[in-house]
UniProtKB/Swiss-Prot annotation:
Keywords for the protein's UniProt record, in alphabetical order: Glycoprotein, Membrane, Transmembrane, Transmembrane helix
Pfam families, alphabetized: UNC-93
Organism in which the protein naturally occurs: Xenopus laevis
Disulfide pattern: none
GO cellular component: membrane
Name of this chain's protein: Protein unc-93 homolog A
Lineage: Eukaryota, Metazoa, Chordata, Craniata, Vertebrata
Regions that span the bilayer: 7-27, 41-61, 68-88, 89-109, 139-159, 203-223, 292-312, 321-341, 345-365, 390-410, 412-432
Amino acid sequence: MKEIKNILIVSFGFLLLFTAFGGLQSLQSSLNSDEGLGVASLSVIYAALIVSSVFVPPIVIKKIGCKWTIVASMCCYITYSLGNFYASWYTLIPTSLILGFGGAPLWAAKCTYLTESGNRYAEKKGKLAKDIVNQYFGLFFLIFQSSGVWGNLISSLIFGQNYPAGSNDSFTDYSQCGANDCPGTNFGNGTGTTKPTKSLIYTLLGVYTGSGVLAVILIAVFLDTINLRTDQLKPGTKEESFSKKILATVRHLKDKRQCLLIPLTMYSGFEQGFLSGDYTKSYVTCSLGIHFVGYVMICFAATNAVCSLLFGQLSKYTGRICLFILAAVSNAACVIALLLWEPYPNDFAVFFIFPAIWGMADAIWQTQTNALYGVLFDEHKEAAFANYRLWESLGFVIAYGYSTFLCVSVKLYILLAVLLIAIVFYGFVEYLEHVEHKKAASTTISQNEDSNSLCKQTAM
């Protein structure tokens, strides 16, 4: 059917695009490590994404529609791949800004397209719109989530040609790897000093750029245009909702529960930023070589996807508090272990155990924090999730921003401190909810007693 065809086209378009971007993101701290250029570009991306989320999507979608917004935004992502061919401050930072400004319209247009398609199909078939939209999003994420596997697999297969079997054996000094890695120091004799050849880097970037171009062609040629309903296009409608959205996002901070959740939301950005920006460079690249970054991140992506599905179901039986505690304990244990561990190539399996545990914990942070926002702020979901995106993105910006100035050990202590603050503040939120539910229950019982008393008096 036409609707499913369009959903599949959008899904595979995003798969192709994020196969390229996801792979590049994992490699930035290792591939463009000079003066911290790689992580600086990632910080700029998320900073631009914050600004873009507030100002750009409604205007662009209104002007050119969902389909062509997706196409134009995908072209913004391709510029980042092109900028990596001649990586410098004059190429990567501008292309990072372009990507960041294109990111918010891309996701907004995708969500609008899938939602509108689901609503129209439900109307036509007389079904519940909510059920159809959920099915469409489920299909999309089923396909999209595998991009983390393919992008990293491609990079490891290509860069693996640069490292003959047994090439690690001649390196013995790894004292500067792991928590001991500091700005301005080299990796000693670790394998991280061996960079892939230019020809291999260009091959990888060529594959990634080609993947992005294929995504654009797929959407531009095969995706059907969907016209937004007339009431959505009336003059002033978007501008009004746009200004209201900004005010609602700011006003939502008056809710003390939202303020208490800021550290937890920012921690999501901190922990993801550490794994992709610091673990990949200071542990994996330094000790094993850049060709293993992809394999390690595949382990994270696969565990994350499986656990996201698992914990989404498990939360019905355990409740969210137990899962949050599990994630906090897992992350805290990993951070402490990373502070103490001296990474050597002989500890090969350990390099994969950390991202596997991290992926499990991240699955809890993502699924349960989103669910928590949905439950706590049921009547103000749009403002709540706007705050969620804002504070998580800010966490990314800070994590990538200080990456080039601090030792890994300091970054691990910061991560642990933010985690502890986040969990304590989250505990206050749960306490407030418990008190609120207790009051509501007492009020209900009191009303029932008054009602029974009134009935008895009437009977007399």
